[in-house]
Each structure stands twice: as C-alpha cells, then as structure tokens.
A protein has these predicted regions:
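Metal-dependent peptidase/peptidase-like ectodomains
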Residues: 1, 29, 44, 82-177
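Soluble metallo-hydrolase cores and metallopeptidase-like ectodomains found primarily
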Residues: 1-48, 61-64, 68-69
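Short glycine-rich loop/turn motifs
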Residues: 17-21, 53, 107
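Beta-strand segments within the central parallel beta-sheet cores of soluble alpha/beta enzyme folds
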Residues: 34-37, 74-83, 108-110
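Alpha-helix N-cap/helix-initiation motif
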Residues: 45-55, 151
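Short amphipathic alpha-helical face segments that pack within enzyme cores
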Residues: 53-61, 90, 94
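A fold-wide structural signal in alpha/beta-hydrolase
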Residues: 59, 76-78, 168
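Short helix-loop-beta-strand segments that form the rim/entrance of peptidase-like active sites
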Residues: 65-90
C-alpha cells in the first residue's frame, strides 16, 4: 500500500516561453530562408509523444542528417521548435510578427505536426499554382502512398502564422492513426 500527498497552488498568469532555433547557412543565397518547424508543447494528460514529439524529433533529425551528410544547402535552412502551439500558435505567431520585415526572404515554411499517422500528401493552402511543384517533390515517395496533392487547406498548426505575411506555409496531410 502506498500513500502520498500532493499540494498544488494553481493560478492563471502570464509565463515566458521560448522558441528553439538553429540554422544551417546557405551557400549561394544565404539571405533566403526555408523554415522547417514543429511545436514543443503538448496538453497535460495529452498525447505529447505524437503531438508533437514526433514532429520535433523529425526537425532535429533533419538538421542532424544534413549536417552529418556534408550537404551544403543553397538557401539557409532554419529549424524552429515553436512554443505555445496548443495555446493558440503563440510561438509561431510571435516569431512571424517579429520577422515580418523579413517575410520576403522566407521562401517556405514546412511544419511537421502529424503525429504517427502515415503522410499521404500535401494540401496546397490556396497556392494551386504550386501543384506541379508538390507533385514533383512527392514523386520519389509515391510508392509509399505519400504523393497526393490536393486543393484545400490544412489548419490548426504553426504554418498558418506565416501566411498573413505572404510566406508560403504547409503542413503535410496524413492518416489519423499510425
């Protein structure tokens, strides 16, 4: 038999949160930036491993793999783990607003907030002119069932914070369960 006691004092007050940012400087166009992002936070008693521990680990692993491979990206690759996504896209909204003057230099924002469900393709986020680009980009993974390109929007995650500033942003489509 185990007995215990926990005393908590809860309150509602502002807290400071941070985004975690790393980058690999581009070799030809270092002022042009491609952001690969995910969010660090989760809900208490929630499924933090899938939402969004998996996305955060993919971002970190992508940075590690690029560095270890010796690849030299032409554009700067910025890897961002956003805070406060579950509370209303707070970290990405603050980052996008702070960097609004640099929005024209941000070429794309790709966010991984997919959990463990299989990636099936990409929603164009109103950028139907990019359909062929995404068809070509996803062609190498078509055999995995991950190459569907569709008109439409994908909401509820950090790429949305950049769209009002004219920055193309996407989050992959996926199956609901892994």
């Amino acid at each position: 038999k185990v007995a215990g006691r926990v005393d908590n004092t809860l309150g509602k007050k502002p807290v400071t949160q941070w985004n975690t940012i790393g980058e690999i400087k581009g070799t030809e166009w270092p002022d042009q930036v491609v952001i690969l992002g995910a969010h660090l936070d989760s809900w208490d008693l929630g499924t933090g491993t899938t939402d969004n521990g998996t996305g955060s680990m993919v971002v970190l692993e992508a940075a590690r793999a690029i560095m270890q491979s010796g690849l030299k990206p032409k554009r700067t690759m910025r890897f961002i783990l956003f805070s406060g996504e579950e509370e209303g896209l707070l970290g990405s909204a603050a980052y996008a607003a702070k960097h609004a003057g640099e929005a024209a230099k941000i070429q794309a924002v790709l966010v991984l907030d997919n959990g463990t469900g299989m990636i099936t393709g990409m929603a164009l986020q109103g950028r139907n002119q990019d359909a062929q680009l995404w068809t070509d980009l996803l062609a190498p993974v078509a055999f995995l069932g991950a190459a569907k390109v569709r008109e439409g929007n994908k909401g509820g995650t950090d790429h949305l914070s950049f769209i009002p500033y004219g920055v193309p942003g996407w989050n992959y489509d996926q199956e609901s369960r892994g």
